[in-house]
Amino acid sequence: MTTQDFLLEIGCEELPPRRLNQLSQALSQTIKSELEKADLSFENIHRYATPRRLAVLVNNLALQQPQRKIERQGPSVKAAFDKDQTPTLACFGFAQSCGVSTAQLKVKKTKKGEFIYCEIEQPGQNTLDLLPNIIQSALKQLPTPKAMRWGDHKEFFVRPVHWIILMLGKDLVPATLLGKMASCETRGHRFHHPKNILVTKPDDYQKLLLTHGMVIADFEKRREKIRDLIQKAASEKGEAIIDEGLLEEVTGMVEWPVILVGNFKAEFLELPPEVLITTMKVHQRTFPIKNKNGDLLPYFIIVSNIESKNPKRVIVGNERVINARLADASFFYDNDLRTSLENRLPKLGDVIFQRQLGTLADKARRIEKLAAFIAKQINIDEQLAARAGLLSKCDLVSEMVYEFPTLQGIMGYYYAFHDKEPPLVAEAIKEHYLPRFSGDQLPRNLLSPCVAVADRIDTIIGIIGINKSPTGDKDPFALRRAALGILRILIEKELSLDLFALLNEAKNNYAVELPNVNVVNQSFDFIIERLRAWYLEKEVPASVFMAVLASHPDDPLDFDRRIKAVQHFQTLPEADALAAANKRVSNILKKQAAELKSKTIDHSLFDSDAEHLLADQLKERAELVNNLYKKADYTKALSELASLKEPIDIFFDKVMVMVDDKEKRENRLALLSSLQQLFSQIADISLLS
C-alpha cells in the first residue's frame, strides 16, 4: 500500500503554558482516533508543542482507504417477489440501482422481517479528500473549556490562529481550518527568526525549525534540554531545586531556552525556605539553588526565551523583581508574627466554610473535638491533638497565606513554633494537609493523622449531610480525594479506627441539624466505595474485595488485613476447592434458612464417620482460629482453615444433607452453618468461586 507522511501544524498566539503538553497529547490522540475510525493505517504519530504552535506528524499514512464490502438493504421479500417468486418491479429497480442482476441479490432475516440485500464492493476514498474533515473532527474534541473567537471568524480555538500547515507528502492539502487557508509555511522564533520557513516535506519539519527557526519543537526534548541546562548552570554554585510542575510550565513558555543565573539579598535567607521557593516560583518562574546540606543559597536560575545581546540586563531585571517580592514576603511574615495563631481564631469566624455548615471557626472547633476523639482511640495525647486541631486553620487568615495559598499549613508550622506551641502540635498543623494528592507522602508522626483524619471526616459528613455528594466527574469539595486520604493514612500508618463510630462522632459535633438523616450510612458507603476504587488501582480482584465486604468490617485497617489474608489464601492449593465448597454450603443454607433457627449440633444424631470427622475438625480448628481472629491474624487463620478441605470433601462425598429425617437434616444443616460461620468471620470465601 502506498503511504506518505502527513503534517499538521496550528500556529497561534501564545498558548497557556500549564496546559500546553495536555493540549498536545489530546490533539495527537484525537487525530489518531479519527484516522483509525476512517480505517486509514499509519506507522506512528509524533507530536510537537511550543508556545506558538501545536503540530502532529503522522508517519507512513495510507493514501487510500482499503476496499470494503457493504450490505445495502432493499425492499422486503414480500414486496420484491410475487406469489410465484418472480421478481417484481421493486426488485428489478433495487438490483439496477446496485448494478447487479436480481439473481445476485440475497435474503436476510431481521427483527422486522425478511428483506433482500446486495453486497457491494465499495472502493476506499483518497486520504487527501478525507483529511480536512478528519482534522476538523479532531479539533472539535480538544479539551478547550476557555476557547476564544477573534476578528470576524466564527471558529473557536484556545488562542487566535495565524497560520496552518496541512501537508501529505510534498503536497498541500487544500483546506481552510480555523479561518486560515492551509499552506506549507511555518514560522520560526518570534524574535530570532520571525520570517516564514518553507517546509518541503513533513519529515523535515522538526529539523527545519531547529536549524532555521531557532525552535526546539519537541516538548519532551525541550523539557529535558532545559533540565540539563539548569543543572549545569547551578553546579557552579550548588544544586538546583527543580520543581517538576514549574519545569513543565517553563517548557511551555519558551521555544529556545537560554539559562541565566541571578542572585538576591542574602538577608532574605532568614525567611522560611518555603517562602523563598514559592516567591521565586510563583512570581518569576525561577529555580532556587541549594548547597550540599540542602540549605538555600542566594541564587536562582532564570529560563529565558531569547539570546539577549545584553544578558546582564535580563538578569538585573529579574533580580530587581525577586528582591522586591521577597521584601514584600518579609513584610508579610513579620506582620504575621505579631499575632499568635490562637489570637487569629476570632478572625476565622469571618470566613465561611460552607453557608449551611458555618464558618472556619466552627470547623476548627469541630476538628478540635474529633482529633481528641481519634487520639483517644489510638492512645495519643488527647490534649495535644485537640490543640493541633483547634489551631490547624488559623494560618488561613494570615497575610502570607492570603498571598500564597499553597503555603497553608506550612506557615502555621512556623507561626506555631514562634508561639512556643509544642513541636508535635506545630508539625501536625503542617502535616494535616497530607496527602494532598494521589501518591503524596503521608504525615510522619502519629499526632498529625488525628488532625488530618478529623479534618477530612468533618468535611465528608458535612457536605454529604447537606446532600451535596459528588456526582459524576463533579466533586467541588474534593470529597473523593479526602476519602482516599483517610484510607491511606489509616491503612498505611496502621491505625485501627471504627469508621462508623468516627462518622457518628463527627455528625454529633455539628451544632446544626444536618438535613440528610442517613448521612452516616451514606458517608460510610462513600468511603468504602473509594476503598474499592483504590484496591482496583492496586489490581486487587473485585471478587476478593466483595468477599471481604460481605463480612462488614468497620475498620479500614482491619479491612486491608482481610484483603491480604484472602489474597494469600488464593495462593494455597486448597483454595479453589474450599471456595467451591463454601459456595455449595451457602446455596444449601439459603434455601433452608427456615430450618436453621437456633439449631445446635447434636453428635448423637450422626450416623456416619464423615459427620464425626467434620464436626471434630471444626471444633479443633474453631478454638485455634478464634484466637487468631482476636489477634487479627487472618492470614494464618485462613491457612489453618485450609486444612478442612479433606473432611469437607469426605462429608459431601459420603453424606446426604437433605434427608427425609427432619432431625438429622436440621443437624447436618447446623453443621454446615457452623462451617460457614467459621470462614465468614474473615470473608465470604464462596464469592471467590
From Swiss-Prot:
Listed GO CC annotations: cytosol
Catalytic activity: tRNA(Gly) + glycine + ATP = glycyl-tRNA(Gly) + AMP + diphosphate
Subcellular location: Cytoplasm
Name of the top EC class for this enzyme: ligase
InterPro entries named in the record: DALR_anticod-bd, Gly-tRNA-synth_bsu, Gly-tRNA-synth_heterodimer
E.C. number(s) listed in UniProt: 6.1.1.14
Annotated signal sequence range: none
GO aspect biological process, one term: glycyl-tRNA aminoacylation
Gene Ontology MF, one: arginine-tRNA ligase activity
Keywords: Aminoacyl-tRNA synthetase, ATP-binding, Cytoplasm, Ligase, Nucleotide-binding, Protein biosynthesis
Top-rank lineage group of the source organism: Bacteria
SUBUNIT field: Tetramer of two alpha and two beta subunits.
PANTHER family, sorted: GLYCINE--TRNA LIGASE, CHLOROPLASTIC_MITOCHONDRIAL 2, GLYCYL-TRNA SYNTHETASE
Record family assignment: Belongs to the class-II aminoacyl-tRNA synthetase family.
Name of the featured protein: Glycine--tRNA ligase beta subunit
Gene expressing this chain: glyS
